[in-house]
Amino acid sequence: MCSMDINRIRHILLDQGFRGCIQISNNKQPVFAQAYGYSDFPNQIPNTLETKFATASAGKVFVAVSILQLVENGKLRLQDTLGNILPLDWHKIDANITVEQLLMHTSGIPDYFDESVMSEYEDLWKDFPNYRIRTNADLCPLFLYKPMMYPHGTKFQYNNTGFVVLAMMIEAVTNQPFDICLQSNIFSPCGMNSTGYYEMDSLPAKCANSYIFEKARDRFRTNIYSVDAKGTGAGGAFTTVGDIEKFWNALLSYKLIPRKATSEMLRCHSGNKEAGYYGYGIWLEPTDSGYSPYFQGRDPGVSFISFYEPSENATITLVSNYGDNVWKLLRSIRECISGK
């Protein structure tokens, strides 16, 4: 990537008023990393490359890796069922849903936040206070008594409940909170020292506040009453752009799971042209030579995407604590990198 490319990328970010952090790496080496905007808007404290950002659904990829690690260690099988691993009263939910179906969003399990019906995550908390959500099990009342969305294994539909249940499986098999398991088996081995799941009312140092703009009142407010009090298997990890690069490097060099398991994770298992294509816990963009993997997340005041471009051996990570359109920025940056 030449200096002209980097200058053009800077102009793209400034022209679109980006607020957050970006890191672009080529051959595992950062070639551009920059922070914009404020982590604390009223006090004008700027974002930095050390700022920890909320990432919404991006955390599903960590849960998927953890599940595949347990499979490799013989503690789980992809064909294990919901009822087998979590022997609860599942009411109208089919206990024969498999681990694999949960991983690739074909389970049909009722979604506590069905993105095909609901547009705003904060609407969930009108009748159920968000401050109660501090574990995966805390979300059970929001889906446990609902009927199946469709027979398991018959279609692809992105589903948040599925990854909450996968995290509950991790907890059942390891006998520890899922975030502690992820810390021990993913974050620490990768050197991701600024990544974790934190309670919104006791955030550690260097965490960015996430802001929602209220047009009617012409002001920003934080999202503390709009998201879970602590992240779950569905998402909610805090991280830095540098830590995400460490994750990609470890994943793609088979330090987290073996080559065969990594290939299966990054292989297309479900999805379609309209909804998108999916591996295990990761999105896939079709290319002439295969697929480019990426993971992403959106919550009120939060937007995140991290994309791997195999043809360039490059990663691009964008995260905003103002919900900026990181997808539009990514398209512009990819065009810049490809020389279009």
Give the role of each language-model region:
Residues 2-55:
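Short, conserved catalytic-motif segment at the N-terminal edge
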Residues 38-41, 228, 323-324:
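A short acidic/small-residue loop/turn micro-motif
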Residues 21-24, 281-283, 306:
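Short beta-strand scaffold segments in enzyme catalytic cores
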Residues 53-56, 156-158:
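Catalytic tyrosine of NAD(P)H-dependent dehydrogenase/reductases that use a Tyr as the general acid/base
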Residues 93-298:
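Short, surface-exposed loop or secondary-structure junction motifs
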Residues 28, 54-82, 166-171, 244, ...:
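Active-site SXXK
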Residues 30, 287-288, 324-340:
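Short, gly/Ser/Thr-rich active-site loops of penicillin-recognizing serine hydrolases
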Residues 31, 304-322:
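Short, well-ordered beta-strand elements
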